[in-house]
Amino acid sequence: MATARATICNKKGLHARAAAKLVKTAASFDARIEVIRLPRAGEEQDPEAKAGATSILSLLMLAAERGVDIELHGEGAQAQEALDAIVALVGRKFDEEE
């Protein structure tokens, strides 16, 4: 299993347009990707705070606002490439102008 971490750094967080871009990126690879919202300092991990990377609704339910760390788990032939692409997308603030 491939893993990676990223910090949501765009102003609006993981909103609908950003989630759609993440889904499009994830779907372009031969891999199954899970996104986990990590707790902030002092919070406990919510066992429900995970989503499949190809489900916009599930990603929106993570409520991942600016500053939230996410962990990505990937399985499949292109898992590492998929995670690298998603981490790059998040790092580019989902290609949004702020």
Where do the language-model regions lie?
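Short amphipathic
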Residues: 1-9
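Residue-level signal for beta-strand positions within conserved beta-sheet cores that form or flank
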Residues: 2, 31, 68
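Generic anion/oxyanion-binding catalytic loop in active/binding sites
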Residues: 8, 48, 71, 75
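Compact, glycine-rich, soluble single-domain proteins
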Residues: 9-65
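C-terminal structural segments of small proteins and small subunits
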Residues: 61, 65-98
